[in-house]
C-alpha cells in the first residue's frame, strides 16, 4: 500500500479560503522505530535523515518529550526549537527563517508536516490532525 496519497490529502487539508496551502512537506513514520511509511520520492515529501525518525518515534512511544525540550526536534538535518506538546500526542516546533513543524501520533504512526516561514501553522496543525485522527479511526 502506498501512503504517499496521504501527503497529498494532508497538504490539501491545510489550504485557507484563498486556496493557499500552509504545508509544503509531510511524511508519515511508524511509531515503533520511526521507519518511513511514505516515500522520499514524493514531490512534497518531508525527508527525515539518519536517526531523526527513530529519535522522534522514541519520544512519542515513551511519551517522554524531555529530549525535544533539551535538544530540539530534528527534521531534514535542521534543529527546530520545541514549542510545546499536548496530550502526549502532539508536538509543535519552530525554526526562525525555516518555518515550523507539527507532529502528531496515532496508535501506530506519527504524522509530520512542515509549515513554511510566513505560513499559518494552525492550518498545518489541522491537516496533520485530520490524517492522524483518520489513521486512529482505522485502529492505526
UniProtKB/Swiss-Prot annotation:
Keywords: Acetylation, Actin-binding, Cytoplasm, Cytoskeleton. Pfam families: Profilin. One of its GO terms (molecular function) is actin monomer binding. The modification N-acetylserine is found at residue 2. GO terms for biological process: regulation of cellular component organization. SMART domains: PROF. It comes from the Eukaryota. SUPFAM superfamilies: Profilin (actin-binding protein). GO terms for cellular component: cell cortex; cytoskeleton. Belongs to the profilin family. Binds to actin and affects the structure of the cytoskeleton. At high concentrations, profilin prevents the polymerization of actin, whereas it enhances it at low concentrations. By binding to PIP2, it inhibits the formation of IP3 and DG. PANTHER family: PROFILIN. This is Profilin.
Amino acid at each position: 500500500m502506498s501512503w504517499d496519497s496521504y501527503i497529498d490529502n494532508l497538504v490539501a487539508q491545510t489550504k485557507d479560503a484563498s486556496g493557499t496551502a500552509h504545508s509544503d512537506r509531510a511524511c508519515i513514520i511508524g511509531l515503533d522505530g520511526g521507519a518511513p511509511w511514505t516515500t522520499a520520492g514524493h514531490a512534497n515529501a518531508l525527508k527525515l535523515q539518519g536517526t531523526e525518525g527513530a529519535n522522534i518515534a522514541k519520544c512519542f512511544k515513551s511519551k517522554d518529550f524531555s529530549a525535544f525540550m533539551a535538544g530540539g526536534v530534528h527534521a531534514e538535518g535542521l534543529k527546530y526549537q520545541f514549542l510545546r506538546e499536548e496530550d502526549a500526542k502532539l508536538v509543535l516546533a519552530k525554526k526562525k527563517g525555516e518555518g515550523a513543524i507539527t507532529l502528531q501520533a496515532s496508535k501506530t504512526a506519527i504524522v509530520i508536516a512542515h509549515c513554511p516561514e510566513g505560513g499559518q501553522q494552525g492550518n498545518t496543525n489541522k491537516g496533520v490532525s485530520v490524517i492522524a485522527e483518520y489513521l486512529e479511526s482505522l485502529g492505526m
